[in-house]
């Protein structure tokens, strides 16, 4: 099971009742965050989730509304008795940007590890999360992220017994490690079924609608996508500032064959996003104009 919370939905600046866009997930005791603008830690507190388990923070880009909340968050995590390293992921220049922000958060009781993205597409494995970062089309270098939880196949008990593999060795095989018994090697594929469908969340803000987004969002259980503009007549402005309209996001969701899309990163001028979602739903019916704190528990297919 993967818990997903859209902490905030605002673009550019926080508003009363609308924090800056940020995502947080929880899986197997580890939390991951994408973006951390001003006030993000307040949104975490309002949700009631813990700071200490945050193991990974990914940044889409370095505009202030996506990273300016980091110093305060780091201090709060430090005050939660965290000692193990925290991994930060983002476009090239991450170390320099974070060092500048840490002028006001110089002492932390844990190490920061940096992963700087330089390629069009990169894959990372961190704390049980399979992360695919992909470069999108914004005014500055910007990445989207797909977060996947893979699921191995079922262990074939009868096959293991037939092969004479002792029960004490089963756990290793289930976790992908070969075992040797009486000079004979047994590999996981001998007793494991085909991989089962996992879980996938794709997150993209601050971009024009480009093919790489729908390619990476393909068959996501949840697609969280910016909808900067919902009103008619905003297409030219979206192109000029390299953002998206509700209908452009809906077309990406349709092309990617996702299960559900949450719109986020609304323009401050968009007071009631839900009033403009109907046109997007004509393109992709499972479109939701998300509000702050919207949460879902994504379950594997046989978990009900």
Curated annotation (Swiss-Prot):
One of its GO terms (molecular function) is zinc ion binding. It comes from the Bacteria. SUPFAM superfamilies: Metallo-hydrolase/oxidoreductase (SSF56281). Its cofactor is Zn(2+). Pfam families: Lactamase_B (PF00753). InterPro entries: Metallo-B-lactamas, RibonucZ/Hydroxyglut_hydro, RNase_Z/BN. Binds 2 Zn(2+) ions. Its EC number is 3.1.26.11. Keywords: Endonuclease, Hydrolase, Metal-binding, Nuclease, tRNA processing, Zinc. Zn(2+) 1 binds at residues 61, 63, 138, 206. The keyword Transferase does not apply. It catalyses: Endonucleolytic cleavage of RNA, removing extra 3' nucleotides from tRNA precursor, generating 3' termini of tRNAs. A 3'-hydroxy group is left at the tRNA terminus and a 5'-phosphoryl group is left at the trailer molecule. The active site is at 65 (proton acceptor). CDD domains: RNaseZ_ZiPD-like_MBL-fold. The keyword Ribosomal protein does not apply. Zn(2+) 2 binds at residues 65-66, 206, 265. Zinc phosphodiesterase, which displays some tRNA 3'-processing endonuclease activity. Probably involved in tRNA maturation, by removing a 3'-trailer from precursor tRNA. Belongs to the RNase Z family. Homodimer. This is Ribonuclease Z. It comes from Lachnospira eligens (strain ATCC 27750 / DSM 3376 / VPI C15-48 / C15-B4). The gene is rnz.
